[in-house]
Amino acid sequence: MKNFISILSIFIIVSCSSGKTPVEEGLESQILHWGNGSEPQGIDPHIVTGVPEHHILIGVCEGLTITDPKGGRENLPGVAESWTLKEDQKTYVFNFNPNARWSNGDRVTPEDFVWSWQRALTPTLGSQYSEMLFYVKNAKKFYDGEINDFSEVGVKAISDYELEVELENQTPFFVGLLAHYSTWPVHKETVLKFGEMDDRSMKWTRPGNHVCNG
């Protein structure tokens, strides 16, 4: 008898439930349900370091290049729809996708990357992946305080749609590094609206504040 009552109770509970899957509920409410495994520490690409954060960032942000989602080794276009390597084999010119946009509608520009890389290389921000950019000419010198003028670092917006990056040495794998979230851009106006360039509070990433480009 007890078993019958237990089974009946389960049947009633199941019958009273909506029966909708998370996917169905998401489609109905237009809310993305993401099974991330664990709580992220944040979503500032220049501060976070973990896998849970990475899983979220690749869904909402984009760098100059992206990794092949099918597992291929080729670097695929991201914000940069194409790029060229000059004869010195150290200088890249990235050509931006004119349709690349921030979530607030602003166009993603080469200057966004210049400012973002300066932020990532600012020691007081404490980015644990700043060395990813040390392949760029004078980037380590700026990080170490040997130079203070960021214009001496080898990253420049040479037009509204072109970013030039000069490296210290020939680095064939550099384009692949640009798919790592620590090299991705952040929205300057939004970051500065909620703090300084090197503010680690991540207020700019909170709900209602966050602007992304993915």
Where are these regions (language model features)?
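Sec-dependent signal peptide recognition
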Residues: 2-9
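C-terminal motif of bacterial Sec signal peptides marking the signal peptidase cleavage site
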Residues: 14-15
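Immediate post-signal peptide segment of exported/extracytoplasmic ligand-binding proteins
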Residues: 23-33
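Solvent-exposed, polar/charged alpha-helical surfaces in well-ordered, non-transmembrane soluble domains
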Residues: 41, 58, 62, 81, ...
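Sec-exported extracytoplasmic/periplasmic mature domains
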Residues: 65, 69, 88, 101, ...
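Gly/Pro-rich hinge or "lid" segments in bacterial periplasmic/extracellular proteins
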Residues: 69-70, 167-214
